[in-house]
Design a protein with these regions (language model features):
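Functional-site microenvironments in short loops/helix caps that host divalent-cation chemistry
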Residues: 4-182, 191-193
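Short, structured beta-strand segments at or near domain termini in extracellular proteins/domains
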Residues: 191-204
Length: 204
């Protein structure tokens, strides 16, 4: 079951890794095209958009014109109260800090609400974290050189890129990758209110 967000213009959330992959397989069958999750290399290439800075807009933390992350529009108290009302058990880290700016959203924003990067790609940092197709490895030493998905390492630990609307500026970085582990359920079956995915279509 996929959970739709606030409106049709918001990203779909509460999607597990397995569900995201199943959707791309269904879409491929329906259209005759090849759709899949991005690899880590593809994701970072599209997120950086030719830049070498920490984020595609530069090295400063404050990027409220470019990304929907944790900022002055939300306090820990209001966030946790809202999550409790939605039935979520999400817990904020003790050192949770927010960017010193306002992006206008407490939670997810409609797709395309912020300035895109130099490639014209929207919402690569913040809004919702995105599943990618690789197996987890803390380093990139064993990553394929051709941009394909890494198939060695811990393949039961799926990877999230881009961070989300409640993540601190520290995590809204083009290089940040997170190998997800759940204490409640099988990793690839786990859903959260800030987990989504981006689809790639192969062009022959």
């Amino acid at each position: 079951m996929l959970f739709r967000s606030i409106t049709d213009k918001h990203p779909v959330v509460c999607v597990s890794w397995n569900e995201a992959v199943a959707y791309t397989e269904w879409l491929s069958e329906e259209t005759g095209e090849t759709y899949r999750l991005l690899t880590e290399s593809e994701w970072e290439y599209s997120a950086r958009a030719g830049t070498k800075t920490i984020r595609f807009w530069g090295d400063i933390d404050e990027g409220c014109d470019f990304a929907n992350g944790a900022d002055l529009d939300i306090t820990p108290e209001s966030f946790l109260e809202e999550m409790k009302g939605r039935g979520s058990k999400i817990v904020l880290p003790e050192d949770w800090v927010v960017a010193d700016c306002h992006d206008g959203y407490k939670f997810s924003a409609p797709v395309g609400s912020f300035i895109p990067n130099n490639f014209g790609v929207y919402d690569v940092l913040g809004n919702v974290a995105e599943w990618v197709g690789d197996c987890w490895d803390s380093s990139y030493e064993n990553s394929p050189r051709d941009g394909s998905a890494r198939v060695s390492g811990n393949c039961n630990r799926p990877i999230l890129r881009g961070a989300s609307y409640y993540d601190m500026p520290l995590y809204l970085r083009s290089s940040n990758h997170y190998g997800f582990e759940s204490k409640q359920s099988e990793n690839k079956e786990t859903r959260y209110i800030n987990f989504g995915f981006r689809v790639l279509r192969e062009i022959n």
